[in-house]
Amino acid sequence: MQIFVKTLTGKTIALEVESSDTIENVKAKIQDKEGIPPDQQRLIFAGKQLEDGRTLADYNIQKESTLHLVLRLRGGMQIFVKTLTGKTIALEVESSDTIENVKAKIQDKEGIPPDQQRLIFAGKQLEDGRTLADYNIQKESTLHLVLRLRGGMQIFVKTLTGKTIALEVESSDTIENVKAKIQDKEGIPPDQQRLIFAGKQLEDGRTLADYNIQKESTLHLVLRLRGGMQIFVKTLTGKTIALEVESSDTIENVKAKIQDKEGIPPDQQRLIFAGKQLEDGRTLADYNIQKESTLHLVLRLRGGVMEPTLEALAKKYNWEKKVCRRCYARLPVRASNCRKKACGHCSNLRMKKKLR
């Protein structure tokens, strides 16, 4: 029968073989065609590295199957694997090693079965059938090892429409994995998802364990709008700040953007919209804040001392009032008569005393 061998350069080699051929025989055929010594060849099929003494039939390799050829680098390299306990393991590997091979090496050193291992690099969970080279893992790179909990747990994801999704997960799942599960259930692409827990937006490369998300916890799903929108933030001094945001941004995110522009720490900011103070863990969508909406920024007072701008506002509010001498009703500064019937719309008014 005929099979194909694909190299990392994209070249495809056609080989005439039999199901009873050993992997060693196949490597010899590749040497005849391409001149690559068998000891520098690694053959991968269905995510597994093929062993020399086994046959094509052993791996269920049939006609027109495609094997992947990666070259064994002479000398190899050293990488590190860091566990959640802080322990660091040094491993001798080659760029052509599959993640499955790396897990086997970890098992040899630490006794952890491969099916309980999850390896993370640059915020991504590594897939068994891929190689270190596929992930651009080079000498002295550090991978992070998290353990796959047996049995897992159930968590819930609540959408803005009120729908609740149940997911089977493990504490070692990354946020990226959770988004993939949501995509499987709801068809929402991961790049349009934002997950919120305890008022914080969850980062793709972190795990549920990193955020102390436990069984039956509820995450909140908001959709990332393509292109975003512009809103305005008005301060008590009258200055207006324009911000580029998305409906799925949390109030905490908005405060961070204000800090970037104005240097005001988030813990000193209070944001007001439609007469309500906005809570950090909620999103702009929760408050129906849309494009070109205006939020009002007031500063959180430290130690009960009134900010100068707020004091000026209070004085202005008190100065520009009149008081009826009979019923003591507070009236607009332009009023000539009291609006209350009880005093007969008295015209005996005085200016309200100034705040000192």
Curated annotation (Swiss-Prot):
SUPFAM superfamilies: Ubiquitin-like, Zn-binding ribosomal proteins. One of its GO terms (cellular component) is cytoplasm. Keywords: Cytoplasm, Isopeptide bond, Nucleus, Repeat, Ribonucleoprotein, Ribosomal protein, Ubl conjugation. It comes from the Eukaryota. There is a cross-link at G76 (Glycyl lysine isopeptide (Gly-Lys) (interchain with K-? in acceptor proteins)). There is a cross-link at K48 (Glycyl lysine isopeptide (Lys-Gly) (interchain with G-Cter in ubiquitin)). Residues 1-76, 77-152, 153-228, 229-304 form the Ubiquitin-like domain. The keyword Magnesium does not apply. InterPro entries: Ribosomal_eL40_dom (IPR001975), Ribosomal_eL40_sf (IPR038587), Ribosomal_zn-bd (IPR011332), Ubiquitin-like_dom (IPR000626), Ubiquitin-like_domsf (IPR029071), Ubiquitin_CS (IPR019954), Ubiquitin_dom (IPR019956), Ubiquitin_ubiquitin-like (IPR050158). This is Ubiquitin-ribosomal protein eL40 fusion protein. The lineage of its organism: Eukaryota, Discoba, Euglenozoa, Kinetoplastea, Metakinetoplastina.
